[in-house]
Regions:
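N- or domain-start disorder-to-order transition segments that initiate the globular core
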Residues: 1-41
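Glycine-rich phosphate/diphosphate-binding loops that line cofactor/substrate pockets in enzymes
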Residues: 37-45, 251-256
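Conserved, mostly hydrophobic/aromatic
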Residues: 52, 261, 326
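Active-site-facing alpha/beta catalytic cores
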Residues: 66, 79-244, 248, 265-270, ...
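Internal helix-turn-beta structural module
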Residues: 303-341
């Protein structure tokens, strides 16, 4: 094998000790984690929003967003529960492009994974301790989960990872809510098999040890649209798509059935303003059908301080990966959801 070591072996406990939750911050996180679990289990009927930037490319911009989101959360907490996207590792279709904070703690400088790992923990820690929001991240690298598992409240297994056995098995050992996206092909069997594997006990090798998990009953579905062989996006948030997904959920008899609609990616064709329309249409479908209302109880929304995207990090709070809703549009959408739920 041709692997050249660029650093000494990372001591996970030393890294975790640099930003460890204690006192009021730890109590706040535990309380919010319990509320989130109750939502996934169907004991709390609030709508879940996993919301925030496509990628957390700038610590101060992310914190400014988190402060605004925290203030908004207080106003709508009786109908909506929000977990903030703090996505620090980004899958790339061909391996090129910005790969996230863990690779590049400064988006304008050379990659540094050692500094990136510290930056990832620091950012999750600061969002929780300075704003009271709890966070979501994507499990792109399963072996890195011990670096953040004490800080995050929600984990997503992405469209390119959902069929991977290691991702599924590691998710089975997570003690927090974990969403599985449908693959880019749109094959729901792949997603549901991932959820099934994660909800059950597994034995496997992890970090050089043989481990056994108890299963993660909080694993659930995220519909993110698909791409056909010609590169055309195929949304799967429509009424018939939802009924098909619910039917498959019921046939498999999985625990805690819960569906999140990812409003961007191949549902919107990355036309970020379409996220608003997709939310509206889904809320209408919930009103039309009690089964949809029972199962579809969350949205994943990509939003940041400024609308759209940019190639280089020039505008503060504007995405350098997928285009996002800006803050004004985000706040208006969240308030609209709140009002609709009260009607």
């Amino acid at each position: 094998m041709v692997f050249k070591a660029k650093s000494p072996k990372i001591n996970i406990e030393e890294v975790r000790a640099l930003s460890k939750l204690e006192g009021a911050a730890l109590a706040r996180k535990n309380q919010r984690d319990q509320e989130l679990e109750a939502i996934i289990r169907g004991e709390d009927q609030r709508i879940l929003l996993v919301i925030g930037p496509c990628s957390s490319d700038n610590e101060e911009a992310v914190l400014e967003y988190a402060k605004r989101l925290s203030a908004l959360q207080e106003e709508i907490k009786d109908r909506i529960f929000m977990v903030m996207r703090v996505y620090t590792a980004k899958p790339r279709t061909n391996g090129d492009g910005y790969k996230g904070l863990i690779h590049q703690p400064n988006a304008t400088e050379a990659p540094s994974l050692i500094n990136g790992i510290k930056a990832v923990r620091q950012l999750h820690y600061r969002v929780i301790t300075e704003t009271g929001m709890t966070t979501a991240d994507e499990m792109l690298y399963p072996e890195n989960l011990p670096l953040v598992d004490d800080l995050i409240s929600y984990m997503a297994v992405g469209a390119r990872s959902v069929e991977d056995q290691q991702h599924r098995f590691v998710a089975s050992g997570a003690d927090f809510s974990t969403g599985f996206k449908n693959p880019t092909s749109g094959n729901l069997n792949v997603m549901f098999n991932g959820i099934y594997a994660a909800q059950n006990k597994q034995s496997f090798l992890f970090l050089g040890k043989e481990v056994e998990t108890t299963g993660n009953p909080l694993s659930h579905a995220i519909l993110r649209g698909a791409l056909n062989e010609y590169g055309k996006n195929i949304p799967n948030y429509y009424y018939d798509n939802l009924m098909d997904t619910i039917d498959q959920y019921e046939k498999m008899g999985l625990e805690n059935p819960f569906i999140i609609i990812d409003t961007n990616h191949d549902n919107s064709g990355k036309q970020y303003m379409d996220q608003i329309r997709i939310v509206r249409q889904t809320l209408i479908n919930r009103d039309w059908n009690e089964k949809i209302k029972k199962y579809v109880r969350g949205f994943m929304i990509e939003s940041y301080l400024e609308d759209g995207r940019q190639n280089e990090p020039e505008v503060f709070g504007k995405s350098i990966t997928d285009p996002c809703l800006g803050w004004d549009n985000t706040e208006a959408l969240v308030r609209e959801i709140y009002q609709t739920l009260g009607e």
